[in-house]
Amino acid sequence: PDCVTRAISLGTGADYRDVQKMLHINGDEKDCDDLCVECYSHMLDEIGYPKLDGNKKTVSDLCNEHKNDTLLVRIEGHLTCCINGNCYDIWDCTGKTVDVYWLIID
């Protein structure tokens, strides 16, 4: 479950603890589990990050297509972060199929 907080913190540059608090507040407001995709998806949408369909691409495919972007990438049961064409995670999920992803815009 730490993957959600870690990916959002890395992708947005926000402090890890601040992201935890934001997720908790969002979960309370939406009456959902802080770390479930339906819950954090609402938060990212409200912040204004465009949500895009993964179109059955792999994490690696997206990294290669977005070499100058920051992405939050959802695969089944996991959220990861790609920055400037590199996937940053504690395990290699680059071969996994993307469900949806968010383009992080400053």
Each predicted region: which residue ranges?
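Context-gated lysine
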Residues: 21, 30, 51, 56-57, ...
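Short, solvent-exposed coil/turn linker segments
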Residues: 15, 58-62, 89
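Catalytic Cys-His active-site segments of thiol-dependent hydrolases/isopeptidases
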Residues: 73-99
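Charged phosphate-binding loop/patch that engages nucleotide di/tri-phosphates or the phosphate backbone
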Residues: 99-106
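Active-site-adjacent substructure of cysteine-protease-like catalytic cores
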Residues: 53-83
